[in-house]
Amino acid sequence: MAYSYSEKKRIRKDFGKRPQVLEVPYLLSMQLDSFKKFIEVDPEANNGLEAAFRSVFPIASYSGTAELQYVSYHMGEPAFDVEECQIRGITYSAPLRVKLRLVLFDKEAAAGTVKDIKEQEVYMGEIPLMTENGTFVINGTERVIVSQLHRSPGVFFDHDKGKSHSSGKVLYNARVIPYRGSWLDFEFDPKDNVFVRIDRRRKLPASIILRALEYSTEEILDMFFDTTYFEILKTKVKMQLVPERLRGETAKFDIKGAEGEVLVEKGRRITARHIRQLEQLDIKEMEVPAEYMVGKVLAKDYANKKTGEVVGHANDVLTLELIAELSEAGIKKIETLFVNDLDHGPYMSETLRVDSSNNRLEALVEIYRMMRPGEPPTREAAETLFDNLFFSEERYDLSTVGRMKFNRRLGREDLSGDNTLSREDIVEVMKKLIEIRNGLDEVDDIDHLGNRRIRSVGEMAENQFRVGLVRVERAVKERLSLGDLDNTMPQDLINAKPISAAVKEFFGSSQLSQFMDQNNPLSEVTHKRRISALGPGGLTRERAGFEVRDVHPTHYGRLCPIETPEGPNIGLINSLSTFSRTNEYGFLETPYRRIENGSVTDDVDYLSAIEEGNYVIAQANVGLNDKGELTEDLVPCRHKNEFTLMSKEQVQYMDVAPQQIVSIAASMIPFLEHDDANRALMGSNMQRQAVPTLRADKPLVGTGIERTIAVDSGVTVVAKRGGVVDYVDASRIVVKVNEEEMVPGEAGIDIYNLTKYTRSNQNTCINQKPTVNPGEPVTRGDVLADGPSTDLGELALGQNMRVAFMPWNGYNFEDSILISERVAQEDRMTTIHIQELNCVARDTKLGAEEITSDIPNVGESALGKLDESGVVYVGAEVNGGDILVGKVTPKGETQLTPEEKLLRAIFGEKASDVKDSSLRVPNGVNGTVIDVQVFTRDGVEKDKRAVAIEEMQLAKVKKDLTEEFKILEEGIYNRARNLLLSNGFDEAKLASVDRSSWLTQDLGNEDAQAQLEQIAEQYQQIRDDFDTKFETKRRKITQGDDLAPGVLKIVKVYLAVRRSIQPGDKLAGRHGNKGVISTIIPVEDMPHDDEGNPVDIVLNPLGVPSRMNIGQILETHLGMAARGIGSKIEKMLKQQRAISELRDFLQQVYDLGESRQKVDITEFTDDEVMRLAGNLKAGLPTATPVFDGAVEEEIKALLKLADLPESGQIRLFDGRTGDKFERDVTVGYMYMLKLNHLVDDKMHARSTGSYSLVTQQPLGGKAQFGGQRFGEMEVWALEAYGAAYTLQEMLTVKSDDVNGRTKMYKNIVDNNLQMEAGMPESFNVLLKEIRSLGINIELEQN
């Protein structure tokens, strides 16, 4: 493959063997595509806003004299961009404007005559917009809407696994689940009658719903049963003979052939052989004794032909008397139902006997009573209710997906249809349920991913929007029916509040709208790819059983089997697999390579879980020869969710890549295939908690997906178009675009502004720094600037540490970690955290709070870091307790004596009635103020600091825009100059003319003149753009801020806190190997090798065997080899060897092993080789893809190439004594992460503080400045030691004995070291609770 200039800077050696068929798709496409569909203006769309409007409009008045129709909609432009919204704490959204048409009909004239039409554009609230990285900014914070995995609409057949009834009988049920509307359930009871439930209310016999659908008893029996007829002749009875129906029965009489020979004797079981005989003889009728008819069930009503009186009703059981009556009435042929116990049960016939209703009206009344108990039913009410349940589009929506699943389950060819139910639908569901009860079909598996679908942002937002619209619809209907509409416009009818409220509620407080996890780029991407089974319309943690949480065979390639949280949510929150995507119906699908006649093609098909079951699919690692043909005769495959061996001709598909089954977080773990799944789960979860370090360090052992994640996460700056870097500084990169990528008539300059030191949601630091230099060529997609945790465009969450696996004086007991002082000195694990502290000045009842530097009872020294407005300077270094913003609050008037009042009135003295309520630095925090922002309410005068900040912002904007303008202007003049030079002008002539007149020269050539005019137009356009941009920015900066009611001013102070590594911090590798730092040891005491190189970290070898995460050992060995290669290159550079030698060595390194990667060093220029070698000095970055990584031989070969022992173990010496350790130790490089569980955030101590009001016990937790809980088990411990006084002290004066506490304080002050324990307050609480039960308890007074 050809590498771009940027990619040649550092090439990762890839150990992957399988060729890449498919690029990893854009990781955030699920979120972006879903929201795009929601917001896209497409009149044909059947989803999104368009569908929501079309489903609610037109709205007609109750009388039908007026109608409000929907025409179209469009989204306006957002008022502020994303950054401004974050700073101001507002929502990034755009106004929605809808064109509506009010049509008035003439009351007097014929129906449908239009009297008047009015069209108008109506504002319908703000819709939050998605940023380009798939997040939403709501009230200034970035949030993510997590997709939901819910049960797909459609029909499901299931059984209760024999749990409902004591007999253990399996009861089958069917459930029709719509997208919205009432659920319809059919179920069997232990007596095998069929019942129906609507919305899980009380059950009714299933025949009631059939009667309500206007089916008679005869029709019902006809639909569910086959019939057998009997012919009554004078002396004998003949029966219709269908041989197949006799299977398994016992002959009640001799069955004879045509000649009278006995085929089956009485009492014998009828076998398949007998049935074949009867079929060959082709007998249509057979003589039976009359008693044989007894117990059969009539299929029709039979009436006396003469009198018309009904003798036998349908579903009546035949008795000898009834047979005689029928025969007397002249009825010769009787049709009966065919039933048997095997596969034609009498279920519906029995159900009809339970059913008390006889006609449609009675059935409707019965349903009405069940749905609305206690209301008197009328015919109209009952009919309306029943029609609205399943047959009205407003109340019931099966949705396209639901209809597709419904038709597919019932085995229909056509998968489309109405989104409401029909008579046939209901009958077919009942037929299918009875088929399943008869053993002719299987029940469904509800955990199959073909029965669970994904609801993404767009769909959930659309549902909420529709909820708002329906509320509006009710109000509009009311208004259309009131008063005169002649002077009414559409705007007067619509109130946008309910819509805004519904949308706002969804984005602000829905369970699936979550505060974005922004620890590092990986955690952002993973959060956006998360799939949750919780949330509205989903499961709840408590009710979810083991089956739902389990890994299902259909998860393969769709949901990751590894990445899920530990704890109560395990298995309910999943992560999308690497290549997975959703199809048009919302089901997850995964790509497979097509195989034809045993050879693999490059065609890739995406299959959903339903389709996948029908194919035979081989693994990604199946053996292939050079032509792409399968080599093995028997191939391990997946078919119908089972693993089997198949011959190679039967194989139809194979996986596209080995890492297809895992999520991106799991595919970041090298040697994942050697780790136990539980540890891999911890590994993938802990990578998301890594804090970005001060200097990112790429992993020496990676998996090759690091670049994809870094680029797709959006934290890096990526070139939109190719070109040459023109200018670089810390906050901006300018690229001159290549001619061929330019749009005709544009300046051809791309300007990228970088983010500097901003705060993330988790208080980590977001900062971008350029990776390119002026003059370097860039191609589209190259990384121009690194963000947090990225290094040259690759994700870099931690640091490569030199580790040794050995015990060291008990300091690494039980997963503790011993680290070297050098790690702290070199700031390897130092992180920067940015905290935002707010000070709000409100308008109180007693007067306004004031931000000022004049604070009562505070010394000069405490105000040293504040300016005259009372706000801290930028750059001040502050510690816990320092004042950041001075603020005073008016105190309530104290009772004054008349003399004081007089003095006050004369001198206007007011100073004493304010109290200090300043913003102070929290305890234990010390850092540097890096930014201050002041927001002032409209109409409140800005203080000096606010004005200064405003001026600074304006100056910055002006400087930025001016520089931008200069760059673009330069580009314009360069193009004009080239045009003039190629049309007869020379350098001297151009130099003599003023630059501004270049654009007005006469060239005497029409084409060239047109080009020059176009350039001049562009120049004018750029100037105009500059003016409008500046004006817009100026207006935004100078206008007052929209603050919450009662707030006059907000000051935000940003503190940067630098945290070095220290004992108590949590470190982890990528294999679930986590630990806490026990101590930091001086470099000279650490174990070192022969050359005196000390190790950075000492880990306990006992942490490996029981955890079964051997991946960490392989990583250590490969890391050692990678570092050894780097050292060798460094030596060659130091010795200034010939560049050909360096080329040969690099070629040898990249060619090692059976890799798919082909790097041809001969294609590199000498400069490029030197730059590559320079970047490899610290170690050769390697990639060992998941399930396709480096094998033992390759690691050994690389170790050998680096002149290191192939065992991966070396001699170490004790740094304190200089003695050699007893045996060789495994030493190598492991990638270690610093997790966001820092001891500084957890360390906490209190002597006295706040107490709970009721129990008078200290509060708990660091945030409340609480005490330590002395719990039940701790009490036992003291009891066990018999430490009575200590225990008494713990339970009284140290806890909730109020008088004892104060007395204790006094005693300590008086140096009288005694204590008296009184009555604990919690005992009084207990007494009061018992009294509240009406039991009086009084303490004996002693």
Curated annotation (Swiss-Prot):
It catalyses: RNA(n) + a ribonucleoside 5'-triphosphate = RNA(n+1) + diphosphate. SUPFAM superfamilies: beta and beta-prime subunits of DNA dependent RNA-polymerase. CDD domains: RNA_pol_B_RPB2. Pfam families: RNA_pol_Rpb2_1, RNA_pol_Rpb2_2, RNA_pol_Rpb2_3, RNA_pol_Rpb2_45, RNA_pol_Rpb2_6, RNA_pol_Rpb2_7. One of its GO terms (biological process) is DNA-templated transcription. One of its GO terms (cellular component) is DNA-directed RNA polymerase complex. Keywords: DNA-directed RNA polymerase, Nucleotidyltransferase, Transcription, Transferase. GO terms for molecular function: DNA binding; DNA-directed RNA polymerase activity; ribonucleoside binding. It comes from the Bacteria. The keyword Transcription applies. The keyword Transcription applies. Its EC number is 2.7.7.6. Belongs to the RNA polymerase beta chain family. DNA-dependent RNA polymerase catalyzes the transcription of DNA into RNA using the four ribonucleoside triphosphates as substrates. The RNAP catalytic core consists of 2 alpha, 1 beta, 1 beta' and 1 omega subunit. When a sigma factor is associated with the core the holoenzyme is formed, which can initiate transcription. This is DNA-directed RNA polymerase subunit beta. It comes from Idiomarina loihiensis (strain ATCC BAA-735 / DSM 15497 / L2-TR).
